[in-house]
Amino acid sequence: MLSINPTLINRDKPYTKEELMEILRLAIIAELDAINLYEQMARYSEDENVRKILLDVAREEKAHVGEFMALLLNLDPEQVTELKGGFEEVKELTGIEAHINDNKKEESNVEYFEKLRSALLDGVNKGRSLLKHLPVTRIEGQSFRVDIIKFEDGVRVVKQEYKPIPLLKKKFYVGIRELNDGTYDVSIATKAGELLVKDEESLVIREILSTEGIKKMKLSSWDNPEEALNDLMNALQEASNASAGPFGLIINPKRYAKLLKIYEKSGKMLVEVLKEIFRGGIIVTLNIDENKVIIFANTPAVLDVVVGQDVTLQELGPEGDDVAFLVSEAIGIRIKNPEAIVVLE
């Protein structure tokens, strides 16, 4: 750098207006250099957390450029005039338009993140089946304690264990050009939310099925309502030995369709009869195998979903011709009384 930094000059008086403008120009240069440095380091970082922080700091530096530029334009009217002149030259040569006070464009740049975030959460909320019915506990930290509860000579905790909260992630990409001109399609964020929910529900079901101590019983074909009712009542009886309920069941749509038959003894469809029995909810999800049905006591004393981080959207920055976004959540399931869970298979 060839210019003299006015802060290095020995002095006994305040800066002049010209020196303040010099300081601001130097500050802008320093911030631009810092932006390049952080983005270059992020580009070659394989650690997602390091990359995330570097890009976040780079965005903060870009805000600092705007702050220093605003002060400089206030002090130096000539700079404003020359900037506008430069914008006009670019427009004549390339057709690209730029404006110092283009409020509409500024609002567009600010709004795209919120529009994508709103579409993402819409996909999550509409796609969820399990979390709409299961007890949810929000905690701080990256792990949770599971207290295994038994009902022998009084209610007591017989075992404690600690588990990490799994972090679920999905990335999606939006074209830089589309973000700039506002032609991007928010449905890509909605789809990312739906895929996150698929991972979320698969994790919950996988954890339930693999938990030590749950009961297992034979699942028949359910070709007639009597078979289905018999299976479910036997499983309910087994689960009720360990909990007073209310009881719910988790079932695949194809298996659920077999409940949409008239149960002759009641004159109603079997599913309507079961809704009166399973007041903890009949949860239909594609994320459980057709040949498995889970009957469980739907109460926090038996199980709850642990949320360490709600669904979050982060802008990671440019990757080629796209801008990358990361969707994440930290979620797990805590099973405290496995004896109140029965799997038909």
Swiss-Prot record:
- Look up the domain of life of the source: Archaea
Q: Where is this region: Encapsulin domain?
A: 110-345
Q: Report which reactions are catalysed by this protein.
A: 4 Fe(2+) + O2 + 4 H(+) = 4 Fe(3+) + 2 H2O
Q: Where does Fe cation 2 bind?
A: E31, E61, H64
Q: Which InterPro entries match?
A: ENCAP, Encapsulin_nc, Ferritin-like_SF, Rr_diiron-bd_dom
Reply yes or no: does the keyword Chaperone apply.
Answer: no
- Quaternary structure and interacting proteins, as annotated: 180 monomers assemble into 12 pentamers and 20 hexamers which further assemble into an icosahedral particle about 36.6 nm in diameter. The N-terminal domain (residues 1-99) crystallizes as 3 decamers.
Per the record, the domain comment is: The ferritin-like domain N-terminal 109 disordered residues are located inside the organelle in the crystal. The rest of the protein has 3 structural domains; a discontinuous peripheral domain (P, 110-138, 167-210, 304-334), an elongated loop (E, 139-166) and the discontinuous axial domain (A, 211-303 and 335-345). The E loop is highly flexible and allows formation of the pentamers and hexamers from the same protein. The N-terminal domain decamer has negatively charged patches on its exterior, and a negatively charged tunnel at the center, the charges are probably metal-binding sites.
Name recorded for this polypeptide? Ferritin-like-encapsulin shell fusion protein
The species this protein was found in: Pyrococcus furiosus (strain ATCC 43587 / DSM 3638 / JCM 8422 / Vc1)
Q: What is the lineage of its organism?
A: Archaea, Methanobacteriati, Methanobacteriota, Thermococci, Thermococcales
